[in-house]
UniProtKB/Swiss-Prot annotation:
Binding site for ATP: 9-16
GO MF annotation terms: ATP binding; kinase activity; phosphotransferase activity, alcohol group as acceptor
Species of the source: Acidiphilium cryptum (strain JF-5)
Any Pfam family hit: AnmK
Taxonomic lineage: Bacteria, Pseudomonadati, Pseudomonadota, Alphaproteobacteria, Acetobacterales
Record-given protein name: Anhydro-N-acetylmuramic acid kinase
GO BP of this protein: 1,6-anhydro-N-acetyl-beta-muramic acid catabolic process; amino sugar metabolic process; peptidoglycan turnover
Family: Belongs to the anhydro-N-acetylmuramic acid kinase family.
Gene for this chain: anmK
Pathway in which this enzyme or protein is active: Amino-sugar metabolism; 1,6-anhydro-N-acetylmuramate degradation; Cell wall biogenesis; peptidoglycan recycling
Catalytic activity: 1,6-anhydro-N-acetyl-beta-muramate + ATP + H2O = N-acetyl-D-muramate 6-phosphate + ADP + H(+)
Nuclease found in the keyword field: no
Amino acid sequence: MHAIGLMSGTSLDGVDAAVIETDGERVFGTGRSATLFYEDGLRARLRALLDAAPGLAPDDPELLSLDWLLADRHAEAVAMVASRADVVGFHGQTILHDPDRRRTWQIGDAAHLAHKTRLPVVHDFRSADVAAGGQGAPLAPLFHAALAEALEKPLLVVNIGGVANITWLGPTGEVLACDTGPGNGPLDDWVRLHTGAAFDADGALAAAGRVDQARLTRLMDDPWFARPAPKSLDRLQFSARVAAATEGLSAADGAALLVAFTAAAIAAAPLPAPPRRVLVAGGGRHNAAIMDALRRHFAAPVEPVEAVGWDGDALEAQCFGFLAVRALRGLPLSLPETTGVPAPLAGGRIVRPGPAAE
């Protein structure tokens, strides 16, 4: 089947769209990909909604407005990769993720998206897992396993978006996955606050700073890091701790500390065996300071996923195209080893377009 996957991450920068050909078990090919960047006003509205999400009512007028608007933006992203497609995999925009209270909330009107694209839309990928006691994240490991079938193991795939997560793939088919801690999220927020830029381009600001090891130790001294995998977190989970640890630092030293925090948290993830290779996806792979920090932690080569021919900018969107096909076939989206769900579990909900308007 040909699927179009859509992913809008917690960095709130836009929506990625990508075409993938798959049966939900193997990847036969990939097609066009594109990113539709959100305008500044939409990013600001989403950031405010994310901050308000714990107390938000489902009928909140701003929520309903953004629910519709996000579907419009995602339909525009589909048009950017316009291709023969059988289904759309629509992750939606996460505004709340609290699996310990069995809550996860992704917004975006899937029915409106189905109407706009005239395609079946699979959405709500995480709720079934969370309701069953799983962490609801990460969901990429089965896709990573399909892509990496021919690669040497053990292999570690690291995705650094707003949150960082890993997939560890063993030599006899073992899979382990979890969120590791903050990704680009705290660093982006820091850079925006102190320089006005959207992110630390090439890691230049962090590279100019010095890491205060005592502050880094305090950041890593959080009970969450002692929890066994699988585990997941919300983008804002460490906000108070980060604010306290960075207080009084220069822009460069704060950026350096947050880069070190991201890398140290990834390296602290409990792995069954050391990887022979570390492949990095997500926006973090463009940050030279993060990549250098990871190389100091791992004995294995640390490379962007492009080193094995994967498209790091399209990978997450491709993943949700892959998962959409799995959902259509009733195949599991999560495993005990990836989200902590008690048994392999299917998920996602399907919305089909109604009759076209006259």
